């Protein structure tokens, strides 16, 4: 898989406990358990807390590495599924999994969005530092060890991205204007 997003059919917030992830084989038998969170975040509305944990998984093209950036928090979780190397990159001073989760409103700030993965790094859209809603997100690049490589503000708003590694072109779509953008990344990441 390239990426996986969870969409539960029936949400029972009082029964949700994402403190660990289970890796299951094709028959549904548990292969591995990965302890991720100490406990659920406290929140006034338990239905809101699920939104903080609902995040897409993105996989390295060839290795058994998976990342999970969180749309409503400054967290990226890293999982090396062949070892016990699991860790988080978190911007200090921002909401953490040990904090009280505020209720979700129209003013709740988005953080991470669409992501594309290459052999050497992944590119991800970051919205938290925008000064207005029409401003383009930042494009951030990280290596697979969690190190920040490069970052730049995109000139136009886009929500989803795709990447052509042969041409080093990033494509972004603005769903509100029905516009497709092409960004040349030849000088963005240098080896």
Listing of model-derived features with the role each one plays in the protein:
Residues 105-142:
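Loop/turn-rich, solvent-exposed surfaces of beta-rich toroidal or solenoidal domains
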């Amino acid at each position: 898989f390239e990426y996986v997003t969870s969409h539960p059919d029936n949400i029972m917030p009082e029964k949700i406990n994402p403190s660990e992830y289970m890796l299951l084989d094709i028959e549904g038998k548990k292969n591995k358990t990965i302890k991720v969170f100490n406990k659920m975040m406290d929140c006034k509305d338990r239905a809101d807390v699920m939104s903080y944990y609902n995040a897409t998984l993105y996989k390295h093209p060839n290795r058994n590495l998976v990342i999970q950036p969180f749309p409503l928090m400054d967290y990226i979780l890293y999982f090396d599924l062949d070892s016990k190397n699991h860790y988080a990159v978190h911007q200090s001073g921002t909401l953490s999994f040990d904090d009280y989760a505020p209720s979700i409103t129209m003013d709740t700030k988005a953080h991470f969005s669409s992501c594309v993965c290459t052999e050497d790094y992944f590119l991800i859209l970051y919205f938290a530092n925008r000064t207005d809603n029409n401003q383009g997100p930042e494009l951030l690049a990280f290596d697979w060890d969690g190190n920040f490589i490069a970052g730049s503000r995109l000139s136009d708003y886009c929500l989803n991205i795709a990447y052509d590694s042969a041409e080093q072109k990033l494509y972004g779509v603005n769903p509100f204007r029905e516009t497709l953008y092409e960004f040349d990344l030849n000088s963005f990441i240098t080896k």
